[in-house]
Structure formats: C-alpha cells, structure tokens
C-alpha cells in the first residue's frame, strides 16, 4: 500500500463508517478511558495507591490504541494495522489540538 492509500483508508474509517458505528472519537474514547480506569482500579488496587493517574483521557486512549497497533506491526505487516495506526494518530491529534 502506498502512503496516500493508507491515509485515505484511515480517513474513510475515522471520518465515516467508524464514527457512524461508534460515535465521535472524543465521546467513544472518553467512555473507553472511564471503563479502563474502573477496571484498572478494581483489578489492581495497589496501582491506585502508587499511580497519580485518576483519569484516562480520550487523548490517552487514542495514543494507547496507537501503541497497540505498533505492537501488532512489530509482529506482522498487515495493511490494516498501518491504516488503523494512522487513524488513531489522527484522532489523537484532533483531540489534543481541540484541548488547546
């Protein structure tokens, strides 16, 4: 896949079908962050005492989902992992710049 094709495929996903299926990235990632936080505090109460992170933000979720894709890329070269990574990075950038 050429870089323009990867970016276009990511644009189609994050600006079309994914948003229609799951809502805006900001809202969806905020919900994911809340659920991850609840899970981590319940599953690992010792972390809650030593970590200052009380809230996983939408930007955090987008960044960590990007890292998940990086881990997948490290073990294979599926085109959709690169497309998804581009999409998560774009969402993280949009969320971060909207916060400023």
Feature names for model-found ranges:
Residues 1-100:
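Intrinsically disordered, low-complexity regulatory regions
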């Amino acid at each position: 896949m050429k870089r323009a094709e990867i970016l276009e495929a990511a644009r189609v996903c994050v600006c079309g079908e994914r948003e229609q299926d799951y809502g805006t990235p900001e809202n969806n990632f905020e919900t994911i962050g809340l659920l991850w936080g609840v899970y981590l505090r319940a599953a690992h109460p010792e972390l809650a005492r030593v970590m200052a992170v009380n809230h996983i933000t939408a930007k955090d979720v987008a960044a960590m989902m990007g890292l998940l894709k990086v881990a997948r890329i490290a073990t294979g070269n599926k085109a959709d992992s690169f497309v998804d990574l581009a999409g998560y990075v774009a969402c993280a950038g949009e969320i971060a710049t909207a916060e400023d």
